[in-house]
A protein has these predicted regions:
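Cytosolic, long alpha-helical scaffolding segments
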Residues: 1-161
Length: 161
């Protein structure tokens, strides 16, 4: 790289592309895990929580589409929208966690399916986090600004209030 004397933009694009490829690979790993866990739910009773997971997955799908569009067009405004959407996904995940705990406490028969649903939801939430990482990489590549500190890392599902 240094033999060709790349400009700062070239280096930022290269670093960002490497980070983005890693995030995309992790997203694929989470998707594979979701598919494996989904097979275990075919014989389980359908819980209302699965509707929340559906809404959460639609939001994350939109985030993925938007972040890929932002990458293709170097659109930092769209990338910022993806970052802002992550908070909603995190809130849905926390709400779902509490809902699933309630189902498990109400009836022991719900423990297995609730556990699978929880891990599916966690994987969807992590896919959203990786979409947000990609959005941050886009902003860095285009503007040279690292948006670190904008969002809180980790989730609040296990925090005691």
């Amino acid at each position: 790289i240094s033999l060709r004397q790349p400009m700062a933009l070239d280096l930022r694009n290269t670093v960002s592309a490497l980070k983005i490829s890693n995030d995309l690979e992790r997203m694929g790993d989470y998707a594979a895990n979701i598919a494996k866990r989904s097979k275990n739910l075919f014989t389980s009773p359908v819980l209302e929580a699965s509707l929340t997971i559906g809404r959460m997955s639609l939001l994350v799908q939109k985030m993925i589409k938007n972040v890929l569009d932002a990458y293709a067009s170097n659109d930092t405004v769209l990338a910022q929208e993806v970052i802002e959407s992550d908070l909603e996904v995190d809130l849905m995940h926390t709400s779902l966690f509490r809902e699933l705990i309630t189902y498990m406490m109400e009836d022991a028969k719900n423990i297995s399916s609730s556990t699978h649903l929880f891990f599916i939801a966690k994987n969807i939430e992590r896919i959203g986090d990786h979409a947000t990482n990609i959005a941050e990489s886009i902003i860095y590549a285009v503007d040279g600004i690292s948006p670190q500190g904008i969002r809180q890392k980790g989730d609040s599902a296990s925090n005691v209030e």
